A protein has these predicted regions:
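N-terminal strand-loop element at the rim of the active site
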Residues: 2-3, 10-16, 30-68, 155-157, ...
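Glycosyltransferase donor-sugar binding loop
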Residues: 46, 200, 223-237, 250-254
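Membrane-proximal helix-turn-helix segments that form the acceptor-binding/catalytic region
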Residues: 82, 131-149
């Protein structure tokens, strides 16, 4: 028996935005290949306007975020839920809860509700105290109104168990291995191999960009430091202004060409990953898959993925030490190799898609008492 599955909570596919869109793109297409009927809800503002994508049905719902800001996300999620209630899906998979769980009483009663519980959004320092309090409340509502839960990090799974006494299925993101084709696409005349440090992140305080660049700024390194990320927001403008006098630091803006990003990661001397909040971060997995040597912020989320196969830092002083002292020798090459092995066997998209299907079928069977053959 194959199921009728809906995926809500993202801006839509194909991915032009971020983590949940990224995984929804892979999982939806993968489930279709396994014979399921899958519908993904897209914002009406999404650049992709067709009604199907790689066999996935696309429903375009009105999204007023462009008119009224963040409040529009709540209206968009409401519109998606109202449509989903009419379509009698077997399973509704909600990616996140920040603007949907307030509508939990409207979740389709005839569908099995599974929520991917996101990464402790209320901890993000970019949010004001009232917003952080609301996000805690939204998390509580998501637990209350969902029947089953997915955690993309073992840290999140432990948190949900300790905080709410609920079990969740650990299913991480995936990544594709760095291909020979991608290597060939990289123009080596643009950047000298291993002659630069690299950071790629949204310009937000919790991504420790200031700490990383301060450490580099205080170093004696003769290498350059490339920063990939949109600097047009308030924090981005602050960062570019603060380090404008260091000619070694190059702000390259946002780059959504995956092959270019992966080539830059692969060729970097050391890739800095400063994310401190959230589950399994897709950009970290991409760096691992791209065979980058990684220095990561010292926190449970990053350590649960990288273990001992990375350098860690807590402050600018430790960043400076890494910049001035890390060598590319046998031990470092072994770290890169071990991370690549993790991508092949733990964070492989085929494994992730299979885990999603297994869990969805298991949840449906538990709810309906039916034996289902995948």
């Amino acid at each position: 028996m194959k199921l009728k599955i809906a995926i809500l909570g993202t801006r839509g596919i194909p991915n032009y935005y971020g983590g949940f869109e990224h995984i929804s793109e892979y999982v939806s297409a993968g489930l279709v290949k396994k014979g399921h009927s899958v519908t993904v809800y897209n914002s009406h503002n999404h650049p992709y306007e067709a009604d199907t994508w790689n066999g996935v049905n696309i429903v375009h719902c009105y999204d007023p975020e462009y008119l009224i800001g963040t409040a529009g996300q709540f209206a968009y999620d409401f519109n998606c839920l109202m449509d989903a209630r009419k379509r009698k899906f077997d399973v509704v998979l909600l990616m996140g809860y920040t603007s949907s769980s307030v509508w939990g009483h409207l979740y389709p009663s005839n569908s099995v509700i599974i929520t991917n519980m996101d990464g402790l959004e209320w901890k993000r320092s970019k949010y004001s105290k009232p917003v952080q309090q609301f996000l805690k409340y939204a998390e509580k509502l998501a637990v209350k109104h969902s029947q089953y839960y997915i955690s993309d990090s073992r840290v999140i799974r432990s948190y949900l168990k300790d905080k709410y006494e609920v079990d969740s299925r650990y299913i991480p993101y995936g990544a594709d291995l760095f291909s020979d084709q991608e290597r060939e696409q990289f123009d080596k005349s643009e950047v000298l191999k291993e002659d630069y440090f690299l950071l790629m992140a949204r310009m937000e305080p919790e991504n420790n960009i200031e700490t990383i660049l301060e450490g580099f700024n205080n170093s004696s390194s003769k290498k350059s430091f490339m920063v990939l990320g949109d600097t047009s927001n308030r924090f981005g403008k602050f960062i570019t202004h603060r380090f404008k006098n260091d000619d070694r630091i190059q702000f390259k803006g946002a780059n959504f060409d995956n092959s270019v990003v992966r080539a830059l990661q692969n060729n970097s001397y050391l890739y800095f990953h400063g994310h401190s909040v959230g589950g399994t971060n897709p950009s970290l997995l991409e760096a691992m898959a791209s065979e980058a040597l990684i220095a990561a912020h010292n926190n449970p989320f990053n350590k649960s993925v990288l273990n001992s196969d990375a350098f860690y830092f807590d402050n600018a002083n430790e960043v400076r030490h890494l910049v001035e002292n890390v060598q590319r020798k046998d031990t470092e090459r072994e770290m890169v190799k071990n991370n690549l092995h993790k991508i092949q066997y733990q964070f492989n998209w085929e494994v992730v898609i299979n885990d999603y299907e297994d869990f969805i079928l298991e949840c449906y069977q538990q709810q309906h008492g039916k034996v289902i053959k995948a």
